[in-house]
């Protein structure tokens, strides 16, 4: 793929080309694809530091995902009030049923410095976080869903309204609400790129095709870009898969 072709979005899906053309995004290393591109991105977008798990969660709740004193969980849009200047954001969040979800689970490689990498951490309703556990992400048939989650509610029956706003779970898989599927995909791509030596490769590959599809159907939006910027203020790095909408297709997706 040539530089001129990439800059014209050749071989890139129409949705991603439009998104890239109308945003603050850029094309990272436009002459590279595949393993070489992954290697360069891993080197150039590694965090300068991670904050430690306690401080990291405090920053997550009070600064990164706090918008005018409101903190929302990724999977259900459940929200709580939390003063961004609080000296105890972890305690306050926990008391109101919010804890930290590792998109790439701790048991699959999010340990050591990676445990507190904010690009892999999101607020979540505690029960929903627990129900997801370390299951891979997947498209779940409605008839196979065991429980549905939205806001502070859990139900066993198929929703009759706003079905796309629900996250779903089975014993072996988890599907986030549709508006966050792309966010989840790009967090997984980030983690597997930056921490490939410790990330469980079988776990990644078991969901790779689904994540590639979600990256297309739920493209990067302004809120995701702003979140990446906020994290960079504390870790010194952006999520490159948010910075560049072509990156997934040039690394893990079109090369499958």
Protein language model features and the residues they cover:
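Catalytic cores of extracellular degradative/oxidative enzymes
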Residues: 73-87, 107-112
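A broad, low-specificity signal for short, low-complexity segments enriched in glycine/proline
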Residues: 31-34, 80-89, 201
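Residue-identity detector for glycine
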Residues: 11, 21, 34, 52, ...
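N-terminal module-boundary/linker segments of secreted carbohydrate-active enzymes
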Residues: 14-79, 247-256
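Bacterial N-terminal signal peptides
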Residues: 2-11
């Amino acid at each position: 793929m040539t530089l001129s072709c990439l800059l014209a979005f050749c071989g890139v899906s129409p949705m991603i080309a439009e998104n890239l053309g109308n945003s603050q995004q850029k094309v990272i290393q436009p002459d590279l694809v595949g393993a070489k591109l992954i290697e360069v991105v891993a080197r150039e977008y590694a965090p300068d530091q991670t904050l430690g798990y306690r401080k990291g969660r405090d920053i997550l709740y009070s600064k990164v995902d706090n918008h005018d004193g409101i903190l929302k969980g990724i999977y259900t849009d459940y929200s709580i009030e939390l003063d961004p200047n609080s000296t105890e954001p972890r305690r306050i969040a926990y008391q109101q049923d919010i804890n930290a979800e590792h998109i790439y689970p701790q048991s699959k490689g999010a340990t050591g410095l990676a445990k507190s990498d904010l690009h892999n951490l999101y607020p979540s309703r505690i029960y929903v976080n627990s129900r997801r556990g370390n299951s891979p992400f997947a498209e779940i048939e409605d008839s196979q869903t065991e429980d549905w989650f939205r806001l502070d509610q859990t139900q066993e029956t198929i929703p009759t309204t706003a079905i796309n706003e629900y996250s779903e779970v089975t014993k072996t898989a988890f599907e986030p609400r549709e508006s966050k599927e792309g966010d989840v995909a790009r967090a997984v791509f980030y983690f597997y790129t930056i921490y490939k030596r410790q990330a469980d490769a079988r776990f990644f590959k078991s969901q790779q095709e689904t994540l590639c599809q979600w990256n297309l159907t739920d493209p990067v939006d302004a809120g995701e870009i702003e979140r990446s910027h906020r994290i960079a203020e504390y870790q010194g790095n952006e999520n490159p898969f948010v910075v560049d909408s072509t990156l997934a297709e040039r690394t893990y997706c079109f090369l499958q």
